[in-house]
From Swiss-Prot:
PANTHER family: OXIDOREDUCTASE SADH-RELATED (PTHR43391:SF82), RETINOL DEHYDROGENASE-RELATED (PTHR43391). This is Putative oxidoreductase SadH. GO terms for biological process: biological process involved in interaction with host; response to acidic pH. The gene is sadH. Disruption phenotype: Inactivation of the mymA operon causes altered cell wall structure, reduced contents and altered composition of mycolic acids along with the accumulation of saturated C24 and C26 fatty acids, and enhanced susceptibility to antibiotics, detergents and acidic pH. Also impairs ability to survive in macrophages. It comes from Mycobacterium tuberculosis (strain ATCC 25618 / H37Rv). Its EC number is 1.-.-.-. SUPFAM superfamilies: NAD(P)-binding Rossmann-fold domains.
Amino acid sequence: MSSFEGKVAVITGAGSGIGRALALNLSEKRAKLALSDVDTDGLAKTVRLAQALGAQVKSDRLDVAEREAVLAHADAVVAHFGTVHQVYNNAGIAYNGNVDKSEFKDIERIIDVDFWGVVNGTKAFLPHVIASGDGHIVNISSLFGLIAVPGQSAYNAAKFAVRGFTEALRQEMLVARHPVKVTCVHPGGIKTAVARNATVADGEDQQTFAEFFDRRLALHSPEMAAKTIVNGVAKGQARVVVGLEAKAVDVLARIMGSSYQRLVAAGVAKFFPWAK
């Protein structure tokens, strides 16, 4: 079991949701925190809560899709703390829309934040994590990085890419014998603001999408998700699946292979009001 006391942990998307919950969980474990988000008000609240728990905190506004900004952030964090042990590439956004209704710019934005944001964070911090001698990269994928769902093609593409990138990175660290563990996280339905802040394709009803997600799919608290993730990191797990429904879907996809797609399509057509 890994210890978190005194470790420097970088968390993107720390202004709310899972990112904030991770920050507070690690604060209780006496980690030092480098927090970032595009939401400066939410980030400031997280900082206050973490400091109230006794954590040393550095915070910065950061759009993870902006590569040069992420590289500069990494330099600033190392200059401040002297090292980095753990990176939680958590920042992400959501989008709902079928391929034929989606604009290129909408798909590109999801890929830029949800995939390239993870790549940017990993690349920027990996040399420092290796140099720490006891490192860990934690990349947040999704339940939708395990199965594909109608209306989520762009999000699926990003989260499947995160999964492939992270699993390959883990193997590279093993082959090179670098002192770095790598974990890919697949949360199920978590009660965050992601759905409420999601963009949708033209003609789609954003409110219906958000309300349905919050009422039917958001089953777990961010605190529960953070606890599960941190426990998995402590154990050095390669994959952390958050929530019983996510674990069930993971098993279903493994058993059914590609035939799961017809089952999911039928379920979405029946129960998801925005998908038709």
